[in-house]
Amino acid sequence: MLIEIPNVFSKQEVSHLREQLDARCWIDGNQTSGAMATTRKRNQQLDKDDPVAVALGQQIMDRLLAQPQFVSAALPLQFYPPLFNRYQGGETFGYHIDNAIRSTPDGMIRTDLSATLFLSEPENYQGGELVIQDTYGQQSIKLSAGSLVLYPSSSLHQVTPVLSGERTAAFMWLQSMVRDEGQRRLLFQLDQSIQTLTAQQAAEQELFNLTGIYHNLLRRWSEL
């Protein structure tokens, strides 16, 4: 399941984020690469311990946890703190699958979901599409600044070469309360239907029944 969430941050907020990011010292992006990815990855990143990156990453996590569509789709249990990357001058990241397990200051997490928050407007760079291959085929993603895409970490994906301009983004992984992608998709679809019926002022008893089904499925499938 691939979910696009528009306007997680406003244009003004993105501009403020970029002012802070652009002033920092960027390093070789292979800092977070797995062994096989190092030959495919050419980009720049902020050090994960950079104080500005840490503060902005926390701001992103706080915003996402307050975003109903994100919470409904991801059912987040634990984040790998957001990182920041930059592509320019032909830099790229060839096809790869994200590492299944990552270490955080609080221990290990299983990477169920990956997310990219775009921080450059698409018209400001050529190339740089996030291309994701999943069960529904190949999808090419290039969203407006402040928008986010969420997708299974098991997906084969790449960032195509940035031929001109500059592509800046935040990226992150998270462990979901529900490990299985198919189960997460069903829960998301059910929750979205409940929200739609609530807005349409559907019969209270039917909403009560559907909400009960949702929570009982979540109770059955979640791992905490």
Swiss-Prot record:
Sites where the protein binds 2-oxoglutarate: R167
Keywords: Dioxygenase, Iron, Metal-binding, Oxidoreductase, Vitamin C
EC number of this enzyme: 1.14.11.-
Binding site for Fe cation: H96, D98, H157
The keyword Oxidoreductase is assigned to this record: yes
Entries under Pfam families matching the protein: 2OG-FeII_Oxy_3, PKHD_C
SUPFAM superfamilies assigned to the protein according to its UniProt record, in alphabetical order: Clavaminate synthase-like
Signal peptide: none
Enzyme class (EC, first level): oxidoreductase
GO molecular function terms noted in the UniProt entry: 2-oxoglutarate-dependent dioxygenase activity; iron ion binding; L-ascorbic acid binding
Cofactor stoichiometry and binding remark: Binds 1 Fe(2+) ion per subunit.
Domain Fe2OG dioxygenase: 78-176
Family annotation (PANTHER family): PKHD-TYPE HYDROXYLASE YBIX
Keyword Metal-binding: yes
GO biological process: DNA damage response; intracellular iron ion homeostasis
Protein name: PKHD-type hydroxylase Sbal223_0741
Cofactor: Fe(2+); L-ascorbate
Residues spanning the membrane: none
UniProt cross-references to NCBIfam families, sorted A to Z: PRK05467.1-3 (NF003974), PRK05467.1-4 (NF003975)
